[in-house]
Amino acid sequence: MTNKKAFKEACKFIAGGVNSPVRAFANVQSEPKFISHGKGAYIFDIDGNSYIDYVQSWGPLLFGHCDKDIQKACQKALHKGSSFGAPTLLETELAKLVLSDFPHLEKIRFVSSGTEATMSAIRLARGFTKKDKILKFEGCYHGHSDSLLVSAGSGAATFNSPSSLGVLEDVAKHTLVAKYNDINSVKELFEKNKDIACVIIEPIAGNMGLVPAKQDFLEELAKICKNNQTLLIFDEVMSGYRASYLGSYGINHIQADIITFGKVIGGGLPAAAFASRAEIMDILSPLGGVYQAGTLSGNPLAMAAGIASLTKAKKKTKLYDKLGTLAKKLTQGMKKLADEKGLPLQACHVGSMFGYFFTKDPVSNYQDALKSNLALFSKFHKNMLENGIYLAPSQFETGFICSKMDDKVIDITLEAVRESFKRI
């Protein structure tokens, strides 16, 4: 079966033919590739084509596809049972592994997705502060729970849908939206609203393309939250263990009240978490009145994969330097080639995360990101795919470097960039 036939068949039985909207390739006026398998830095579609994969399952695969250590850990766990709905030692082991490197985090709760993590963190913040409103930032995506699907990035930006049908106005009215990297917009909202339970932010935004928050902006944001008895939530579902081993904390050293984790923490399996100090976490059920639960939360396969992934990342002391060097080479190379062709391009990286926009102006917020030339992006994506490079099929997503990549892979990619720029 070909990719084209597979998508046509999928559309008969799966809504939209995919189980997450951006996978449909609609934003690049194309059809998705159906993947048969992956190995290291590469994926292979059912037509027999191979691609250097810069999506890496949208971030979780720090060590690329089919990493032997993670596979071995999963196989060992699977032989004992896939899920019990009861505590296992693996949950405590992964909890200790995560908390040991964050002095301000004392307890953690595992869930199965980033959406669950942020949704639960919001509920926890409201329960702890006894306040109703939440403040988020335009273009930041925190999963698809109702209160957070307001002025969202990621898929919502891809489909020009800042919110969603089905999100009740009575729910959305409790969500305040500020401008990313603009502290004055935050101050204005705090002046008008005295019942803000929490501020949630991607400290390294990866869902409007890659847009890191400025250090002084985050520092001032933390002060405002503290002065108003408002909890600060860092959504590190994407940036955790990606931007650095300690995510944004390893870069900006700001201690958020709650951190959400995901992607890498599950080593490629469905897992996420939220963590905070004990006085906050202890109001979760069964100790307190904030309810959160999940049938597969902390399941042994995901915990085993997470332990293997984080243990390996922690042991490889030069891993993040290598990934950052490769990401820098890629983004600087893209910028140089664009300049040579007279194409407007902004490109940047943070650790193993990278992004690019077809615009002449620097990008520091969602409105800047929206200025990117989407027609150019679409043409570029199509040409890169034809040249064997698999990039995220949306301008408003982030790319990822994995440990199986090297200078040769980047050189091949930059040659594909050169050829693609010639055609667009």
Swiss-Prot record:
Pfam family, one: Aminotran_3
Catalytic reactions of this protein: (S)-4-amino-5-oxopentanoate = 5-aminolevulinate
Pathway: Porphyrin-containing compound metabolism; protoporphyrin-IX biosynthesis; 5-aminolevulinate from L-glutamyl-tRNA(Glu): step 2/2
GO molecular function: glutamate-1-semialdehyde 2,1-aminomutase activity; pyridoxal phosphate binding; transaminase activity
Residues found modified as N6-(pyridoxal phosphate)lysine: 263
GO cellular component entries: cytoplasm
Essential cofactor(s): pyridoxal 5'-phosphate
Gene3D superfamilies listed in its UniProt record: Aspartate Aminotransferase, domain 1, Type I PLP-dependent aspartate aminotransferase-like (Major domain)
EC numbers, comma separated: 5.4.3.8
Subcellular location(s) of the protein: Cytoplasm
One GO term of the biological process aspect: protoporphyrinogen IX biosynthetic process
The entry's keywords: Cytoplasm, Isomerase, Porphyrin biosynthesis, Pyridoxal phosphate
InterPro entries: 4pyrrol_synth_GluAld_NH2Trfase (IPR004639), Aminotrans_3 (IPR005814), Aminotrans_3_PPA_site (IPR049704), PyrdxlP-dep_Trfase (IPR015424), PyrdxlP-dep_Trfase_major (IPR015421), PyrdxlP-dep_Trfase_small (IPR015422)
Family under the similarity heading: Belongs to the class-III pyridoxal-phosphate-dependent aminotransferase family. HemL subfamily.
NCBIfam families per record: hemL, PRK00062.1
Cross-referenced PANTHER family: GLUTAMATE-1-SEMIALDEHYDE 2,1-AMINOMUTASE, GLUTAMATE-1-SEMIALDEHYDE 2,1-AMINOMUTASE 1, CHLOROPLASTIC-RELATED
Subunit field text: Homodimer.
Name the record gives this protein: Glutamate-1-semialdehyde 2,1-aminomutase
Organism ancestry: Bacteria, Pseudomonadati, Campylobacterota, Epsilonproteobacteria, Campylobacterales
